[in-house]
Swiss-Prot record:
Catalytic activity: cytidine(2498) in 23S rRNA + S-adenosyl-L-methionine = 2'-O-methylcytidine(2498) in 23S rRNA + S-adenosyl-L-homocysteine + H(+)
GO cellular component: cytoplasm
Entry's localization field: Cytoplasm
Lineage, highest ranks first: Bacteria, Pseudomonadati, Pseudomonadota, Gammaproteobacteria, Pasteurellales
Top-level lineage group: Bacteria
Protein name as it appears in the record: Ribosomal RNA large subunit methyltransferase M
Subunit and partners: Monomer.
Gene that this polypeptide is encoded by: rlmM
Length: 362
């Protein structure tokens, strides 16, 4: 078991490969990446046998930008017999159980990649889950409580209906969602589908127990590039008053709430009203990521806000390098000023050729 499988958005396999290579090296782990273009996943093969498990425990999943899921996997099982796929899978898990206590397992996820071709397997995966779960429980697995120390999820990652990786992830260091995807329902009254990006960002970056404390009716926000109001909608829904900055029109439904002021200005030139404390800045403007990074940094250095969520658009070829440069620029500028901060970034399911960044002064 010297392999990690990392799920990612189709077309971002090279970024995922570069990131896991860098982050593993920081932990003193080296290996090579197997990349298939547009497959929606990569396999990182460690040079030493137990290092994949070490990374699954110790490499902070929340710090991986392009990974939707991270799990330790076996060699690929191929030519699974159609009449009995379960037996070879259980045999593989029995080998894993010699080193890993599978009695600590709490859940089973039977998954495939998030590609148009692989999605055809989803129906099969759903049907296969029930009989496999019953068989694994007979082995004494999948019976631990959700609060089990060192709890595990068991995963099957199908490439075809007769070929899969068998693996596991650690409950404290993974995504609990099937395929690593947090699926959200589009609100019927939202002005645009971009609203789901900010909703997913809030659910991803802000601790559930802190959401109402950090986002409530006593707070003020600025939305740069707000039109028609997809991101403003999420803030107003949580009670915030929003200065919506855009030359374009905002949805009438948002004006009717009485919780927005439309500022028909350039997002790069706008400054918050004097003597008005701004808690949050959000920004989904289509612009070079370096310009957005500079603008966001300016807001923090000027003391105009203390928390922000923004997107960095990535249409260029060297996307991973661009992300690293932008995040390093922000971190360097804030550190030089002596500011303590929390910085997280993620390629969210509802993002496309972009990543979402969460930044908060401490």
């Amino acid at each position: 078991m010297n392999k990690l499988a990392l799920y990612c958005r189709m077309g971002f396999e090279r970024e995922m490969a570069a990131e896991i290579t860098d982050k593993a090296a920081e932990k003193g782990v080296f290996g090579f990446v197997r990349v298939i273009e547009n497959s929606g996943y990569v396999i990182f093969e460690c040079y030493q046998a137990d290092e994949a498990d070490y990374l699954a425990r110790e490499l902070d999943f929340q710090q991986l930008i392009f990974a939707r899921q991270m799990l330790v996997v076996s060699d690929l099982l191929t030519d699974l017999p159609q009449q009995d796929r379960i037996t070879p899978i259980v045999q593989q898990y029995q080998q894993i159980a010699d080193k890993i206590d599978l009695k600590q397992s709490t859940e089973l996820l039977v998954e495939t990649a998030d590609t148009n071709e692989a999605k055809e397997l989803l129906g099969f995966c759903r049907k296969f889950t029930v009989p496999l779960r019953q068989t694994l429980k007979k082995q004494g697995w999948l019976r631990a409580s959700n609060h089990a120390k060192c709890g595990l999820f068991l995963h099957l990652f199908f490439l075809r209906n007769n070929a899969c990786y068998v693996g596991y992830s650690y409950n404290h260091n993974h995504s609990a969602h099937l395929m690593g995807i947090q699926r959200l329902k589009f609100p019927a009254d939202a002005p645009s589908r971009s609203t789901l990006k900010l909703e997913e960002a809030i659910l991803t970056f802000i601790p559930r127990q802190k959401e109402t404390e950090w986002l409530n009716e006593n707070q003020y926000a600025v939305d740069l590039g707000a039109c028609p109001g997809g991101w403003t909608y999420q803030l107003v829904k949580r009670g915030l008053f929003v200065y919506a900055v855009d030359h374009g029109k905002m949805a009438a439904s948002l004006h009717e709430t009485g919780r927005i002021e439309h500022c028909a200005e350039d997002g790069f030139k706008f400054q918050p009203p004097k003597r008005q404390k701004i808690d949050w800045l959000v920004c989904d403007m289509v612009e070079k990521p370096s310009r957005i990074a500079e603008l966001m940094t300016k807001w923090l250095l000027n003391g105009w806000c203390h928390s922000m969520i923004f997107n960095l658009k990535l249409p260029m070829k060297k996307r991973y390098a661009e992300v690293q440069q932008c995040l390093q620029y922000i971190a360097d500028k804030l550190t030089q000023r002596g500011l303590a901060f929390q910085l997280k970034a993620k390629h969210l399911y509802h993002d496309r050729e972009e990543i979402t960044v969460y930044l908060r002064l401490l």
